Regions:
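Conserved N-terminal catalytic core of the sugar/cofactor nucleotidyltransferase
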Residues: 2-13, 39-110, 114-118, 122-125
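A structure-centric signal for secondary-structure junctions around beta-strands
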Residues: 9-12, 30, 102, 131, ...
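Short beta-strand/turn micro-motifs composed of small residues
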Residues: 18, 61, 109, 136-139
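Hydrophobic residues at beta-strand termini and immediately following loops
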Residues: 36, 79, 158
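Glycine-rich N-terminal loop/short-helix segment of MobA-like nucleotidyltransferase
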Residues: 10-36, 71-72
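Conserved core of the sugar-phosphate nucleotidyltransferase
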Residues: 66, 115-167
Length: 167
């Protein structure tokens, strides 16, 4: 009787961006620590990340992150972004922590508590089927952030909605 060859799945790591200070919320707490139904926003994102069963979860936090680190100790590794220079810079802060990791890396925002595991699993599946080097999960909004692409279609930069102009 024949056997079926199953290709091993690549290792998976999740980077969670949790550097927001909550200034637009008029709060001194880290944005990801604001509660929804009695739990910090970051708790929901971590639960979704954990359901992907990654080998590593690395959370990028801001300079005043003691509350976040104490609350989530043991569930994630932390790296700090001391100077906030945008989304791309925040992602780069995880590079050293993942320098010996050779699998797929998925980046999530820590302030997206409504993200569900099924959506992420679908994205991971589509990425693996397509063989894409970069996969973005996006949604249609009235005031979206923007992706600026070069002539070949590669992402050059992320423009936050607050910085976007009509250009």
């Amino acid at each position: 009787k024949g056997s079926v060859m199953v290709e091993p799945q690549p290792q998976l790591a999740v980077v969670i961006l949790a550097t927001g200070q909550g200034t637009r919320m008029k709060s001194r707490r880290a944005k990801v620590m604001h509660e929804i139904a009695g739990k910090p926003m970051l708790d929901y994102v971590l639960r979704v990340a954990e359901r992907l069963e990654p080998q590593r979860i690395v959370t990028v936090v801001g300079k005043d992150s003691e509350e976040v680190e104490a609350y989530f100790e043991g569930r994630t590794e932390f790296v700090r972004q001391l100077n906030q220079k945008g989304t791309g810079h925040a992602v780069l802060q995880a590079r050293k922590a993942l320098e010996n990791f050779s699998g797929e890396i998925y980046v999530l925002y820590g302030d997206t508590p409504l993200l569900c595991a099924e959506t992420l699993r679908g994205m991971v599946s589509k990425k693996r089927i397509s063989g894409a080097s970069l996969t973005l999960l996006s949604t249609k909004r009235r005031l979206p952030g923007l992706l600026q692409r070069d002539q070949e279609g590669f992402v050059e930069r992320i423009i936050e909605s607050t910085d976007a102009t009509t250009e």
